[in-house]
Amino acid sequence: MQNIAGVGLGLRRELIDDYLQAEHVPDFIEVAPENWLGLGGRHAKQFAACVERAALFCHGLSLSIGGPHPLNLEFIGQIKQFLKQHQALLYSEHLSYTHDGGYLYDLLPIPMTEEAVDYVAERILKVQDLLGQRLVIENVSTYAMPAAEMTEAEFVCAVLQAADCELLLDVNNVYVNSINHGSDALAFITAMPPERVRYLHVAGHQQISPDLLIDTHGAAINDPVWELLRATYQHIGVRPTLLERDFNIPTWQQIQSELQQIQQLQQEAGDV
């Protein structure tokens, strides 16, 4: 599979016009395939034009890899076709669940137990067999740790090993969880196996109280997350890094400024 480097942008529809008109665009874009499956006409043409300008990563929302119900094989087949049709370089999903008899409209944490490791790994292996490629799983932000028997870092590493999959390391989520649970963000980063880290996410968050952050993707990246990203490059090496901005969409110039800041950190880390 082709590799890509550099900086990327989570492409939201509010950004598409600016993206298509921009003289310089990111190295890659990322979309949720669920938002584009089955669309035709103007939307399909617009999406095709976007993909022509940059490499495509796909980041799913509803696989529910940790959910209690059987995997949706029809949906996985649709994803496989979408990835092939648009020549997506990878498919990532959240290490969480979104279905419990119905769609829950949230990313809920999986109990961090040995039993859950085995269960999730079996489902990831099944998805990888069906897709014919590795799945990239993302560490998620959490606000409670139900029935935890191990740390988050231990759980993520165990799943990566058991399923032989790759990691989308979300640096903002690591920081958010460190505040919400009183954990060590840098210790989490250094515990991740560098050879399995495929790419990174960074984003802004909302502070509700001194010990509660919400991963909103609705604000600029703040200084502690920038510093954690710098440390991440130092410990695991420079990886493709994507900016997420889902709400309170700023100007294209502001988006470009954050992308350039990511690029600057990558260049500095590459010079070390």
Which residue ranges define each predicted feature?
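C-terminal helical cap(s) of enzyme catalytic domains, especially alpha/beta-barrels
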Residues: 252-272
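Acidic/histidine-rich catalytic cores of soluble enzymes
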Residues: 128-212
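Boundary/entry segment of secreted carbohydrate-active catalytic domains
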Residues: 1-19
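Active-site acidic/histidine proton-transfer and metal-coordination neighborhood
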Residues: 72-167
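Gly/Pro-rich active-site loop or hairpin
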Residues: 38-40, 70, 107-117, 178-237
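Acidic (Asp/Glu)-rich catalytic clusters
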Residues: 19-24, 41-58, 74-89, 125-130, ...
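Hydrophobic faces of well-ordered beta-strands that scaffold small-molecule active sites
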Residues: 5-11, 27-31, 56-59, 91-93, ...
